[in-house]
Amino acid sequence: MTVLAGTAFAWGMNWLRQSRRSWQPAAVAVFSFGLLLPLGEMIRLHPYQYTHFNHIAGTVRGADDRYMLDYWGLALKQASDGLREELIDRQETAPKGRKWKVAVCGPQRPAQVALGPDFTIGWDSHSADFAMTLGEFYCKGLTAPVMVEIKRDDVVFARVYDIRGRSISSLLAIPAP
């Protein structure tokens, strides 16, 4: 598709050069403007620019209900960094004799790498201190205090909840039939 678009643009520029040379700068300006529109959107979404959807698809906001946006779970890295910063700001330390426990709904490896050795990562939300969830359909929205929220363009990519002292049966949502 890209080759076809490039060929069509080159053909159009050649045609303009031969028949309406004075229109070439305007054509280049329109073409450049067309390239800058999605670039601006991707800059706003950074580092999640791979989730960009054009205006025909409804942008990221419109696509959020129809598609998995952060299927790689990269927002969990930023959420992990936010959790570590929040714990430092609050001057909280792990309970005596154990590491912080984080239940993760989504790919666990990004959170595990970002959090490091001071945290235990797993699925079990019963004994966890925190819950880290992707903003995807399969992760349940919890009624617990939100410690960290990763948002772009009004779309939640990830959240970290403080679930200490709460009974959370599962982080997985039951999809509608």
Name each model-derived stretch:
Residues M1-L4:
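Transmembrane alpha-helices of multi-pass, membrane-embedded glycan-processing enzymes
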Residues G6-F53:
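Signature aromatic-anchored transmembrane alpha helix within multi-pass, membrane-resident enzymes
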Residues E41-Y67, W72:
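Juxtamembrane membrane-water interface segments immediately following transmembrane helices
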Residues V60-P177:
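C-terminal luminal/periplasmic domains and tails of membrane-associated envelope-modifying transferases
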